[in-house]
Amino acid sequence: MAKEGAIEVEGRIVEPLPNAMFRVELDNGHKVLAHISGKMRQHYIRILPEDRVVVELSPYDLTRGRIVYRYK
């Protein structure tokens, strides 16, 4: 369910940062800075270190992303 042109990749939360930002290590080894999507904030979905997540990356800036799903 990625936006038009967005890239969806899986990763693992490495560390929480201020302002609902997270450092995420992708499965390919890269580390990106990601924030929580609006729907996840609305539904109070908590994200903890070591959680597996799906991150949506923009093709314009591959170092930043949006967390769109947390695996149970």
Curated annotation (Swiss-Prot):
Gene designation per UniProt: infA
Ranges for domain S1-like: 1-72
GO cellular-component term (any): cytosol
Primary location recorded for the protein, binned into one broad class: cytoplasm
HAMAP family the UniProt entry points to: IF_1 (MF_00075)
Function statement: One of the essential components for the initiation of protein synthesis. Stabilizes the binding of IF-2 and IF-3 on the 30S subunit to which N-formylmethionyl-tRNA(fMet) subsequently binds. Helps modulate mRNA selection, yielding the 30S pre-initiation complex (PIC). Upon addition of the 50S ribosomal subunit IF-1, IF-2 and IF-3 are released leaving the mature 70S translation initiation complex.
CDD domains in UniProt: S1_IF1
Organism the protein comes from: Corynebacterium jeikeium (strain K411)
Protein name: Translation initiation factor IF-1
Subunit structure: Component of the 30S ribosomal translation pre-initiation complex which assembles on the 30S ribosome in the order IF-2 and IF-3, IF-1 and N-formylmethionyl-tRNA(fMet); mRNA recruitment can occur at any time during PIC assembly.
Pfam families hit by this protein: eIF-1a
